[in-house]
Regions:
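A beta-rich soluble binding module of mature secreted/lumenal proteins
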Residues: 2-6, 26-191
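Basic polycationic patches enriched in arginine
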Residues: 3, 10-13
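Bacterial N-terminal signal peptides
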Residues: 13-24
Length: 191
């Protein structure tokens, strides 16, 4: 069967459509995970400390990890993530932008640090009284963060949040506790 002399022209038009579908799939919510309703981005704004996480290459080895969220006039959320790399003896920082997937009252966003690649950011547990802690999922159960307004979270609260994630089939046995002590270089010199 002949594809005709112009068949190769179809591929360039198909690639953007395929890329759009693949990139959109990176922002979805894992099945069974329900983002918080009644979300107030103004109260969520500010500094959050990473208490526990499922480790990934982009954070591997980092201590003292924080996220800073800032509401922008255009309706997006500015994101600054930073952490200390003991091996390099330096702070690492990345800036990005997040947009609500749908209704801003639902804690489900898509975030980018490297356009055009977006990832899901879904707050599925939140201290809605005081916004003191949050549990966040990425687009799959391979991404999980427990965040708090202070560098430490009471053990009973932390255990309850881990149990909530366990009930939703996150691999909580792989969670690591993030060190928020004074930054120490592997050579032994703190900065």
């Amino acid at each position: 069967m002949s594809r005709g002399p112009f068949a190769f022209f179809r591929l360039p038009r198909l690639l953007p459509a395929v890329a759009a579908v693949l990139l959109a799939g990176c922002t979805g919510v894992p099945g069974g995970v329900e983002p918080v309703e009644g979300f107030d981005a103004g109260r969520y704004e500010g500094r959050w400390y990473e208490i526990m996480r499922l480790d990934h290459r982009f954070e591997r080895g980092l201590t003292n990890v924080e996220a800073h969220y800032t509401l922008r006039d255009d309706g997006t959320v500015g994101v600054v993530n930073r952490g200390f790399d003991p091996e390099a003896c330096s702070w690492k920082q990345v800036e990005g932008r997040a947009r609500f997937r749908d209704d801003p009252d639902t804690a489900s966003l898509r975030v980018t640090f490297f356009w055009p690649f977006y990832g899901g950011y879904h707050v599925f547990a939140l201290d809605q009284d005081d916004y003191r802690w949050a549990v966040v999922s990425g687009p799959t159960r391979s991404y999980l963060w427990i965040l708090a307004r202070e560098p430490e979270l009471p053990e009973a609260t932390r255990e309850a949040l881990v149990e909530k994630a366990r009930e939703l089939d996150f691999p909580v046995d792989e969670l690591i506790l993030v060190d928020h002590g004074p930054p120490v270089c592997e050579s032994g010199n703190g900065r």
